[in-house]
Amino acid sequence: MRKLFTSESVSEGHPDKICDQISDAILDEVLKQDPNAKVACETFATTNYLLIGGQITTTASVDYEKIARDVLRKIGYNNDAYGINADTCKIDIRVEQQSADIALGIDLDTEVIGAGDQGIMFGYATNESKTFLPLAITISHELVYLASKLRKEGKFKWARPDMKSQVTIDYTDESNPKIDTILMSIQHDDEMIEEEFKKFIKSEIMDVVAKEFELNTDFNVLINPTGRFVIGGPQGDTGLTGRKIIVDTYGGYSRHGGGAFSGKDATKVDRSAAYMARYAAKNLVASGLADKIEIQVSYAIGKPEPVSIFIETFGTEKVSKEVIAKALNENFDFSVNEIIKKLDLRKPTFLKTATYGHFGKDEFTWEQLDKVKTIKK
């Protein structure tokens, strides 16, 4: 029996990703002025309309509308035909302060910070790719990233901002994985030459990415399977912050606790603890303790320390699980304040996470491999 696994990604122009970017752009602007601010910002997008809401407690002065329009403009939504226009769309703001009840548990003092909510978070790493991420999600990200880049550079004729990718990897021979199928759905102008459009996608995007990963190019190809993708963006589908949590993480290859990332400051463990769990899992795998590691962590609202931590190696461990648990406990502190300090999560760097995955990019602090030497000892 063949072993096939599939993951998907979306471009920065996807309606849900528009919302993630606006929420994280607002978070960054708040943190620039007030690093200790409490932020939970949500965005809703539909045809030429945005609603920005949430709870934000800060001393910062923020122009929410300007930030939202700037994000839309940078993506390329500057035309009414695209579903939303940065210059003409209506924007409503419904932002309030954080609940005083929640603040009781979080604002303990500067050194002891309670978790912003209860919940479970997962972190995962595998040695099947250079980024320590599963191949399917990694390739999916690269496809839409390249397509968007070519569009912005004016090299991708007829393409519009809304794009999706889906990659199926054949793991029948686990030592030699292959691409089975690549699907791309790319919004396009009303008038275009379909054959030329599809030929460009196969040769200049799909094949280029496959070769980058030193994988086969004789895969099954699906491009805009309905035959037409003119109506897209928030006109084609309503967008919401936090609705692409599997795209943001491991493409379904690892479990997910259900909490979204974007628009949340680091006291929200949905985000910060998931980053820390990824950081720990990646360093443990890079140290050679296992081929695959998944870490689950849980918290109670207002409590600074996790309620539980669980490690799964899927039978790929190279040392005993006791040794792996010891390495985790000795090298990684999952208290909320220590996560924030270790990963430097008071800085305004979150907008970069809102597209093409929160993991696998070397510039992020939770992707550094600074614990490997210590663990190997």
From Swiss-Prot:
Q: Which UniProt keywords apply?
A: ATP-binding, Cytoplasm, Magnesium, Metal-binding, Nucleotide-binding, One-carbon metabolism, Potassium, Transferase
Residues the record lists as binding ATP: H14, D162, M163, K164, R228, F229, D237, R243, K244, A260, K264
| Disulfide partners | none
Cofactor dependency: Mg(2+); K(+)
Query: Where are the residues of the annotated region Flexible loop?
Result: 98-108
Any note on cofactor binding? Binds 2 divalent ions per subunit.
Per the record, what are the reactions this protein catalyses?
L-methionine + ATP + H2O = S-adenosyl-L-methionine + phosphate + diphosphate
InterPro entries attached to this UniProt entry: ADOMET_SYNTHASE_CS, S-AdoMet_synt_C, S-AdoMet_synt_central, S-AdoMet_synt_N, S-AdoMet_synthetase, S-AdoMet_synthetase_sfam
EC numbers on record = 2.5.1.6
Q: Which Gene3D superfamilies match?
A: 3.30.300.10
* Listed pathway(s): Amino-acid biosynthesis; S-adenosyl-L-methionine biosynthesis; S-adenosyl-L-methionine from L-methionine: step 1/1
* Single GO cellular component term: cytoplasm
Please tell me where L-methionine binds in this chain: Q98, D237, K268
Tell me the GO molecular function terms: ATP binding; magnesium ion binding; methionine adenosyltransferase activity
Q: Which SUPFAM superfamilies match?
A: S-adenosylmethionine synthetase (SSF55973)
Q: Which residues bind Mg(2+)?
A: D16
- Residues involved in K(+) binding: E42
Pfam families noted in UniProt: S-AdoMet_synt_C, S-AdoMet_synt_M, S-AdoMet_synt_N
The protein's job, in short, is: Catalyzes the formation of S-adenosylmethionine (AdoMet) from methionine and ATP. The overall synthetic reaction is composed of two sequential steps, AdoMet formation and the subsequent tripolyphosphate hydrolysis which occurs prior to release of AdoMet from the enzyme.
Can you state the subunit structure given in the record?
A: Homotetramer; dimer of dimers.
Family that this chain belongs to: Belongs to the AdoMet synthase family.
Write down the HAMAP family for this protein, in alphabetical order. S_AdoMet_synth1
Q: What is this protein called?
A: S-adenosylmethionine synthase
